[in-house]
Amino acid sequence: MPLLEFEPLQEGVLIKRYKRFLADIELSNGEVVTAHCANTGPMTGVLIPGQRVRLRHAPSPKRKLAWTWEQAEVPGADGQPCWAGINTALPNRLIRATIEAGCLSEQLGAISNIRAEVAYGTNRRSRIDLLLTPGESNPDQRLIYLEVKNTTWTDGTTALFPDTVTERGQKHLIELMGVLPEARAVLVPCLSRPDVMDFAPGDEADPRYGSLFRDALEAGVEVLPCCFRYQSNEISWQGLRPLKKFQNL
């Protein structure tokens, strides 16, 4: 089921990514362009010089770069290549579209309003990705604080987050636990590749995040790993994925 549709992306080959935000890409006509890379992390397992990539051309006087790197072709869990979404600015919009399409109605119940980037937490210095107001028919009338995490790192068919130490991610888990029990707290790993079958915390990359993740589950934070397929002109819903059984740290 397509959730986001857009003009077909252009394909190229990744030459290199550098200074975190920049990537040199050779287009099919041989032209080399510099594209914005919104993903500032290590991009473990999805950053492969020479790989096929897809990028969006959107020149504007307000933008320094006319190109944005959107997708990367990566080795899939079944040995076949698949496409991963690497633009970390996109998942919030994608998850909002998922909710509005009713894909999570069984888990969240009826929703009457969605607000983005709402201040909350300690001294209201954090911002929740999405704040959901339940509809009248929802049996649970608590507000829903929903945090989204783009997830592309894998171990076999298991999606893992994070792929590096993330103090920001640790803080988000603490803040989510802080809204309980007066509100619901939901963590949504946005599984931005179609070849994954379950989700687990990236203990190897960030043991403290893994420990806080377990604390959050015990405290009542809900985790809804949402899987998507990325194509050149659309992103489609692939369904929820379960949590993998994992040991306590």
From Swiss-Prot:
Pfam families: SfsA (PF03749), SfsA_N (PF17746). Gene3D superfamilies: 2.40.50.580, 3.40.1350.60. One of its GO terms (molecular function) is DNA binding. It comes from the Bacteria. Belongs to the SfsA family. NCBIfam families: sfsA. This is Sugar fermentation stimulation protein homolog. The lineage of its organism: Bacteria, Bacillati, Cyanobacteriota, Cyanophyceae, Synechococcales. The gene is sfsA.
